[in-house]
């Protein structure tokens, strides 16, 4: 008989619902714990997205920035652990991870649905498909660019960009007063960062050029996507 991992007869297949937790190895327990924690953070991330849609000022909260960075770290850690430890999984471990993966996929579908609703809302308000599809594409490119510059200022610019994206939309660009308010806000945060005692001169010089670049890109996004009604509190 050929060796196989399949059970052709249902009465001979192991029942995962009656499996004992003690059968899991320490490696499996660690992986399942981290994956479950990652799924919980994904759910909290979706809830924060929904709250920030209703209250854009939440994007300035340090809790939000810390949660997003921690969520990104666990994403990479989960992938690394999966590639390293997955071959040693038993049947019970695979069954548990299948349920967790299903939950994660469901959460990602919710996030995609929220983005689709925002797109439909923007299309309904502007009446232009080009404007509606332009905003998400430009902000995704901005997000990828900022991920390559892991500085506090870059994170700040990303949060301000999200405020533009989640704010009210209309068919006119940002006013000069709104651009001035944005510049004051960004420069104020940047001044506090560059005066930090733990910041080296080399990092300040390198990040200074990055700051000017991101400020230019952010203003271009605001004008290019024709966003308005941004509230600065």
Curated annotation (Swiss-Prot):
Description of how the protein assembles with itself and partners: Homomultimer. Interacts with envelope E protein in the budding compartment of the host cell, which is located between endoplasmic reticulum and the Golgi complex. Forms a complex with HE and S proteins. Interacts with nucleocapsid N protein. This interaction probably participates in RNA packaging into the virus.
Primary role: Component of the viral envelope that plays a central role in virus morphogenesis and assembly via its interactions with other viral proteins.
Membrane disposition: Multi-pass membrane protein
Keywords: Host Golgi apparatus, Host membrane, Membrane, Transmembrane, Transmembrane helix, Viral envelope protein, Viral matrix protein, Virion
Localization per Swiss-Prot or TrEMBL: Virion membrane; Host Golgi apparatus membrane
Domain of life: Viruses
Protein name: Membrane protein
GO CC terms: host cell Golgi membrane; membrane; viral envelope; virion membrane
Segments passing through the bilayer: 32-52, 70-90, 94-114
